[in-house]
From Swiss-Prot:
Protein name: Transmembrane protein 39A
Membrane-spanning ranges: 72-92, 110-130, 154-174, 182-202, 287-307, 319-339, 420-440, 446-466
Gene from which this protein is expressed: TMEM39A
Keywords, sorted A to Z: Autophagy, Endoplasmic reticulum, Glycoprotein, Membrane, Transmembrane, Transmembrane helix
Sugar attachment sites: N31, N39
Subcellular localization: Endoplasmic reticulum membrane
Subunit structure: Interacts with SACM1L, SEC23A and SEC24A.
Principal location class: endoplasmic reticulum
Organism: Bos taurus (Bovine)
Amino acid sequence: MPGGRRGPSRQQLSRSALPSLQTLVGGGCGNGTGLRNRNGSAIGLPVPPITALITPGPVRHCQIPDLPVDGSLLFEFLFFIYLLVALFIQYINIYKTVWWYPYNHPASCTSLNFHLIDYHLAAFITVMLARRLVWALISEATKAGASSMIHYMVLISARLVLLTLCGWVLCWTLVNLFRSHSVLNLLFLGYPFGVYVPLCCFHQDSRAHLLLTDFPYAVQHQAVEESASTVGGLARSKDFLSLLLESLKEQFNNATPIPTHSCPLSPDLIRNEVECLKADFNHRIKEVLFNSLFSAYYVAFLPLCFVKSTQYYDMRWSCEHLIMVWINAFVMLTTQLLPSKYCDLLHKSAAHLGKWQKLEHGSYSNAPQHIWSENTIWPQGVLVRHSRCLYRAVGPYNVAVPSDVSHARFYFLFHRPLRLLNLLILIEGSVVFYQLYSLLRSEKWNHTLSMALILFCNYYVLFKLLRDRIVLGRAYSYPLNSYELKAN
């Protein structure tokens, strides 16, 4: 009727009175969102949070077989043999002769100039390279235990004799080197220890790698927080000498325990576990870097520092040998300190952590957005705001801090369980192919001998890497519901 009151149209009812599905899924009083009408005023309807509407699925982990890993004593013995072979090859590269020439030419009758070799330096290098093997022998003997008093006295006597012998050889070689060389050359003998002090002594957060996973939820949460605060307090209160002694003790201690994973339910526990694993991983990488550089320094670089100025040698080939020794030592130590079980542990923790992708301003303006909460487990595809930036959840299970770069880096490195193993295979395979190419093109006898000897050592390392890659590749490629799953 003209002049009568008109009711709201169907289009107005659909716009103002009914909440949209996006608002129901993305809204929440705690997240700072709510229902709004056409004019922009808020409607006081309670909206459930996103965790009540969308529950992330459980994180499922693959079961991997227990691959054989070399024991501490066996690995140190093989590593020591490899370093001795590399040291022998470097001495061949430096002191080789042309022994096949006729006698009417000024040549040597031996393959090496043995009279130019400093045997005190060779003995010093051998003892320094054997330090881990000696400590592994002492550790294994200590773990065996003593069944009687006589057995205990024999173990103590053997340890004292072994350590005394090593110390006497070091002192004897240092005294003779001090008599025949300048002080500048002697400084090269202890240079790696000067690098180790700032590299490892002032980073005591690695003590947090002992994860407390055998306790209930409340006890575990309290224990992790107390251990983190205790670690920080100890690192601040200890003096330089204590830090140095602890770092040197860890340098000789080969048996580093592998942490465990407990599939925690709380976001705080997940982040604390990631922090502990991150500190433990950084500690292991530092040990790998230092020991590989230490080995390459004493095997391939230190003999060059004590060569006489009148001695000619192939500088390019010696430097190439130095690089090869460092790469091979790095791969061998990484394989031992980061085994497949440890990489699977990091992968499981990264699956619980998740990742956030930073988006540009203005994008997804019509999509529901939430305020990030540290006590919420966010599902995949959710948009949150944190520190005035917009982020999107990438993983199916996300508890990471969006602005924390270390969390994103941890997820990138370990969310694929075979990434580290593939990288090691790529490095070692490239070295093997390059050495085969150099072996085919080599014309000098010392080049052929050095490549042939080093290749035998590299074949063993490459075989172990390829074996682990094939077995783990098949284990991770199986569908998750084809065997027993572990879900939190």
